[in-house]
Amino acid sequence: MDPRIDQLAKNLVQYSCNVQPGEKVQIQSVGESPKPLVRALVREIYAAGGHPFVELKDPVLTREIVMQGDETLYKLWEEVDLYKMRQMDAYIGISGADNVNEMADVPSAKMRLYMEKYLSNLTNERVNNTKWVVLRYPNSSMAQLASTSLEQFEAFYFDVCNLDYGKMSKAMDALVERLEKTREVRIVGQGTDLSFSIGEIPVIKCAGENNIPDGEVFTAPVKDSVNGVISYNCPAVYNGFTYENIVLRFENGKIVEATANDTEKINQVFDTDEGARYVGEFAIGVNPYILKPMKDTLFDEKIMGSFHFTPGRAYEDASNGNASAIHWDLVCIQTPEYGGGEMYFDGELVRKDGRFVVEDLEVLNPENLK
């Protein structure tokens, strides 16, 4: 067994989920490649005194089900899986699909039905009522997305996933404190001039508890406060389709105009429901090892010098009241290589070209987190 896999399993069980004796842990694995990690997790959960429950999923079969699925199917499927989820104390989700585009040709109406009638409530139950963590597993598909060899990608992956998240967590405290005092945020960059309020919405740090890799601090904008335009410079894969050159224009919180490489298709996403045209999350990425996009949200949203501004559902622990079947983390990178940019808290410049420029936040610059 690769010792890096053993270390990752230990981090997931002991740090991310903090599994205690007697606790029930669901391991949900997608694809063939994560099996070595699943095996290590089972051993680690037993060592912690917990009870592992393993569920293996195949994206090809999921696509086949969704292509034909109806409300009757999803109602019972949701009922069964909600029952199982409600018995769990913790959840570890691992994605290792061989083809990230497996769902690309599923009609949008069928995907919407699947998400609304099955996936949405199940996700809410997992997020709000279990100790959970989700991650990808390094395979050839991910290496292709990152334009590297598998060996090189594995080295990058384990550096990112096994870094000292305890150190990162302490460093994030200063940013949490800053954001808690902030009322107005303005972000400026190439094709971007965006402003919004945070108000009294809570600020949450993410340092390896729920996502691996991790490295973000998030809150949410006051729902109707967002105005201006944002040009995202990071490709975004949604239901198997890669969107690029996404530009959103906001008026009083609502997306009133959306364009992309497929403008019709992206507007279908934002027409999923009323909440899909409002933003449920604003987050700042700080992972020092992730420097460029690889078309994988779990990595891209943590890019050092980035932020993401997320149409759709807000998280309960930092809620602005927005509800939706979607939660789509769209990323904008502000490092010099991607055009630079500035971030202001209550009129004060706090980050320029991806680097924090105020003394209390410099601890989050990459050289201080490695």
Which ranges hold each PLM region?
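Active-site bordering "gate/hinge" segments
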Residues: 1-228, 359, 364-369
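Short, glycine-/Ser/Thr-/acidic-enriched flexible segments
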Residues: 32, 97-99, 139, 201, ...
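A short, compositionally biased
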Residues: 178-184, 242-244, 335-342
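Short aromatic-centered micro-motifs
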Residues: 187, 249, 343
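Long, well-ordered mid-to-C-terminal structural blocks that present hydrophobic/aromatic surfaces
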Residues: 224-268
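Active-site lining segments that contact anionic ligands and/or coordinate catalytic metals
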Residues: 227, 243-245, 252, 277-281, ...
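Dual-mode signal for accessory low-complexity, basic/Gly-rich regions
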Residues: 257-323
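Internal helix-turn-beta structural module
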Residues: 295-369
